[in-house]
Curated annotation (Swiss-Prot):
The gene is RNASE1. Transmembrane segments: none annotated. Gene3D superfamilies: Ribonuclease A-like domain. Residues 1-24 form the signal peptide. Substrate binds at residues 31, 34, 65-69, 90, 109. Endonuclease that catalyzes the cleavage of RNA on the 3' side of pyrimidine nucleotides. Acts on single-stranded and double-stranded RNA. It is found in: Secreted. It comes from the Eukaryota. SUPFAM superfamilies: RNase A-like (SSF54076). It is an enzyme of class 4 (lyase). The keyword Magnesium does not apply. Its main location: secreted. This is Ribonuclease pancreatic. One of its GO terms (cellular component) is extracellular region.
């Protein structure tokens, strides 16, 4: 009798643990938003912007992320890039798209000699076209691939 219950309860326990694990995991779209979206602010020439944002957005935990870009445009405008000019991603995949117009961004680059846990970044505000990888349903940005100067 006790063995019958354990045979039934064990698979149920495994299923519950799998579901709970998935619920706690950040989706690729949410990770993109956390790492790259800063819609509520303008590009800042404040030299501490990147140091503050990289720490606030959990990109200096365990290591210093070497490069990151924040986009200062409404999320819907960045999501719309997924339906603009299709381009090849840096890694050769074909799910990247380039914005049709320039966007306000801030590039953050780890300064030479900076080491974890004292991550220090150079802040560079720019206006550039962005290239993002998109996937899912709905089709949304999941990876920031690059930024390029507007050729027009």
């Amino acid at each position: 009798m006790a063995l019958d219950k354990s045979v039934i309860l064990l698979p149920l326990l495994v299923l519950v643990l799998l579901v709970l694990g998935c619920l706690g995991r950040e989706s690729r779209a949410k990770k993109f938003q956390r790492q790259h979206m800063d819609s509520g602010s303008s590009p800042s020439s404040n030299s501490t912007y990147c140091n503050q944002m990289m720490k606030r957005r959990s990109m200096t935990q365990g290591r210093c992320k070497p490069v990151n870009t924040f986009v200062h445009e409404p999320l819907v405008d960045v999501q719309n890039v997924c339906f603009q000019e299709k381009v090849t991603c840096k890694n050769g995949q074909t799910n990247c798209f380039k914005s049709k117009s320039s966007m306000h961004i801030t590039d953050c680059r780890l300064t030479n000699g900076s080491r974890y846990p004292n991550c220090a970044y150079r802040t560079s505000p720019k206006e550039r076209r962005i290239i993002v990888a998109c996937e899912g349903s709905p089709y949304v940005p999941v990876h920031f691939d690059a930024s390029v100067e507007d050729s027009t």
